[in-house]
Each structure stands twice: as structure tokens, then as C-alpha cells.
Design a protein with these regions (language model features):
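Pre-Walker A (pre-P-loop) alpha-helix and adjacent loop at the N terminus of AAA/AAA+ ATPase modules
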Residues: 1-33, 39-86, 138-139
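AAA+/P-loop NTPase substrate/partner-engagement loops
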Residues: 103-134, 141, 161
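A short beta-strand-to-loop transition that corresponds to the Sensor-1 phosphate-sensing loop
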Residues: 155-157, 178, 199-209
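Conserved catalytic/switch belt of AAA+ P-loop NTPases
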Residues: 156-195
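Pre-Walker A (Motif I) flank of P-loop NTPase domains
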Residues: 77-83, 148-150, 200
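AAA+/SF3 P-loop NTPase mechanochemical coupling elements
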Residues: 145-149, 185-205
Length: 225
């Protein structure tokens, strides 16, 4: 703030620094959305009924979602869940998570498409020193959700390009799903500032599990749709 006070308010540097500070203040450090449930058995029954409304059949999928909810409810202070929904196009993978899991758990839903992504910077931002730089999609999800434990849905994991730039994206996803490191995630725009992603619920969707990096796949609870 002292640097800001010393700058000319009409200068580009003033606007750039003020935007940076405002963005930091918008990150919901330490703010979590919690499930306030008094009767868990009743809550599960209601959750199953709500899932039946948005998912026709697919009892195995609904069972997995209820299992995730049970694990989460048993210890809301533990690390988030990492799982993947896979199957052919058009079977409702996004609907299952957006209208099913997220609503049942009362958590903000965030959608990130990996298909066609050029490099990892769209996820972890660009350095503040670059003109026009900004933070990445992951921090954007936290800011929009106003909490550190939203659902973040990565679509088309198997469509990441098989190039060095694609490998950058995969390596970043490996990093944010590593529970020994993801409490200290750093967006390049906010270099030096640790951001806790350990409470996020990461969901990956894909058609072909054979195209997924083995290290990343080992961390994902797979749900066939």
C-alpha cells in the first residue's frame, strides 16, 4: 500500500499495482463452505432423492457420489477428494457433477476445459511483471466461489495435447493433486504467496482412461458412467 500511495493515480503502474492488491484481497484465504447437518441419515436419504431427479439409472455412479459425501462429512477438515468420471460423449458426465454432486454438497461448481489448452499458464497465471498479466483459472475459481473448498471440474482430460506444452499442463495437474504439496500452490501472478488447494474437490472428466498420465490416474478415484 505504501508503494501505491507514492504513485501517480493516473499512471499505468498505479492501476496495475492497485489491481494486483485488489486481486489478492479477493482470494478467500481460510474461508470454507461447510455442511451443517444435524441428521446425517436423513441428509443421505434426501441426497439420494435429489440425485435420482438429475441422474436416470446409473445406481453405481450415485453410490460413488454418496460414498464421497459420507467420507467428506465424516471429516470436513481433511483434504479434498480427487476423482474422475469417464465414459462416452453424451452420457451426462458434467450434469452428474454440476447438478448432482455440487448441489447435494452445496458447493460452488467451476468448469475448466482442458481441450485445446495451449500451456499451463492458463491454469497458474502469468508473472506480474508482464504487461496485461493476470492470475490463472484455478485462482479464478476460488475467487468466484468465495471459498477454498469448491468443486473444480476439469473437462476433457484426455484431450490435452501430446506435446511439451501439454506435458506442462499434466505436470501442473499432478502438482495440485499431490496432497503433500497442494496446500502451497503458487500462481505465477501471485509469486511467493501460498494458496491452499488441499480442500478443493477436483473432478476430471474424460472418454478414454488409457490416454491419462499414469501418475495422475493413480490419484483419481475412477467412476465409470
Amino acid at each position: 500500500y505504501k508503494d501505491l500511495e507514492n504513485l501517480d493515480k493516473s499512471s499505468n503502474e498505479y492501476y496495475k499495482l492497485k489491481t494486483y492488491i485488489d486481486n489478492i484481497l479477493n482470494i478467500p484465504f481460510g474461508i470454507s463452505k461447510k455442511l451443517n447437518i444435524t441428521n446425517f441419515s436423513e441428509y443421505l436419504t434426501t441426497s439420494k432423492s435429489n440425485l435420482d431427479k438429475v441422474i436416470y439409472g446409473q445406481e453405481n455412479v450415485k453410490y460413488h457420489i454418496l460414498e464421497i459425501i459420507s467420507q467428506y462429512f465424516s471429516n470436513q477438515t481433511c483434504s479434498g477428494n480427487i476423482f474422475g468420471v469417464y465414459g462416452p460423449m453424451g452420457v451426462g458426465k458434467t450434469t452428474i457433477i454440476k447438478d448432482g454432486l455440487s448441489k447435494v454438497m452445496n458447493k460452488p461448481f467451476n468448469f475448466i476445459s482442458l481441450g485445446g489448452a495451449q500451456d499451463s499458464s492458463f491454469l497458474d497465471g502469468h508473472s506480474y511483471t508482464y504487461e496485461g498479466s493476470t492470475y490463472g483459472k484455478i485462482v479464478d475459481c476460488l475467487i468466484k466461489s468465495k471459498c477454498i473448498n469448491p468443486v473444480i471440474y476439469f473437462d476433457e482430460l484426455d484431450k490435452i495435447s501430446n506435446t511439451p506444452k501439454g506435458d506442462e499442463i499434466v505436470n501442473l495437474l499432478i502438482h495440485i493433486t499431490d496432497d503433500s504439496q497442494n496446500c502451497n500452490f503458487q500462481d505465477k501472478y501471485f509469486s511467493g504467496i501460498n494458496i491452499d488447494l488441499s480442500k478443493c474437490i477436483f473432478v476430471f472428466s474424460f472418454n478414454d482412461p488409457t490416454k491419462i498420465n499414469n501418475i495422475l490416474k493413480d490419484r483419481i478415484q475412477l467412476i465409470k458412467v
